[in-house]
């Protein structure tokens, strides 16, 4: 065998291991794709079971944080004279307040205009002292200090203003369910008197999950 044949044989011998090595990444890629699909299905399953702080007639749905759910309360403001104010403390059901150490992450207010609504209202949520009587003067000062976000909701011909939600983040404050009695929803009727049949406020309190009863009520 001459020198050229020896060189050619040597090259062929060196190629064989490389042919075998090419199949390894292909197998690993297939396994990775299967694992990715399984994780994707798992994420979809977990997301589907997570509560959502939304309402079918409202836009901008928000999924609750993992491990959290929400409790909703409804507030219907009484008549508010033009340029006047209304305040209501957050009072959760007893079935929720008994777990007063569960953390609260966010408070969401959804403004639901009724058919007769034709006004402009300002809405906010504030932490208030236990001694506060939520008088007109006290509420007016809280709107003026700029310490909380304010939602300005105006009449819209479509019936629902594009932005009808206010989201108040309490995560950094480490607030819990027991603290909710220290918070109040405040309303300012700016341009017109707000009648009792014009507006409903839905307040969603996002909090850590609480045990549910396994016994039917008597």
UniProtKB/Swiss-Prot annotation:
GO terms for molecular function: RNA binding; structural molecule activity. Its main location: virion. It holds the Pfam family Cucumo_coat. InterPro entries: Cucumovirus_coat, Cucumovirus_coat_Asu_sf. Residues 1-28 are annotated as: Disordered. One of its GO terms (cellular component) is ribonucleoprotein complex. The keyword Ribonucleoprotein applies. It is found in: Virion. Residues 11-21 have a biased composition (Basic residues). The modification N-acetylmethionine is found at residue 1. Keywords: Acetylation, Capsid protein, Ribonucleoprotein, RNA-binding, T=3 icosahedral capsid protein, Viral nucleoprotein, Virion. The keyword RNA-binding applies. Belongs to the cucumovirus capsid protein family. The N-terminal arginine-rich stretch does not seem to be the major RNA-binding region that allows formation of an infectious ribonucleoprotein complex. Capsid protein. Probably binds RNA and plays a role in packaging. This is Capsid protein. It comes from Cucumber mosaic virus (strain NT9) (CMV).
């Amino acid at each position: 065998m001459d020198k050229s044949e020896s060189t050619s044989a040597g090259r062929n011998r060196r190629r064989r291991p490389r042919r075998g090595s090419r199949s390894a990444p292909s197998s690993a890629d297939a396994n990775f794709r299967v694992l990715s699909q399984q994780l994707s299905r798992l994420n979809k399953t977990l997301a589907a079971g997570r509560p959502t702080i939304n309402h079918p007639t409202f836009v901008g749905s928000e999924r609750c944080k993992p491990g959290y759910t929400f409790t909703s309360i409804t507030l219907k403001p009484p008549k508010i004279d033009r340029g006047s104010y209304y305040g209501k403390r957050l009072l959760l059901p007893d079935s929720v307040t008994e777990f007063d150490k569960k953390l609260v992450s966010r408070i969401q207010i959804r403004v639901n205009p009724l058919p007769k609504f034709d006004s402009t209202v300002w809405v906010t949520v504030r932490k208030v002292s236990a001694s506060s009587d939520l008088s007109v003067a006290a509420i007016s000062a809280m709107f003026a200090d700029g310490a909380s976000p304010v939602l300005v909701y105006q009449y819209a011909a479509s019936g629902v203003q594009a932005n009808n939600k206010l989201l108040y983040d309490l995560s950094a404050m480490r607030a819990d369910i027991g603290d909710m009695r220290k918070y109040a929803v405040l309303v300012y009727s700016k341009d017109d008197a707000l009648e009792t049949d014009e507006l409903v406020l839905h307040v969603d309190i996002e909090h850590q999950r609480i045990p549910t009863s396994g016994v039917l009520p008597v």
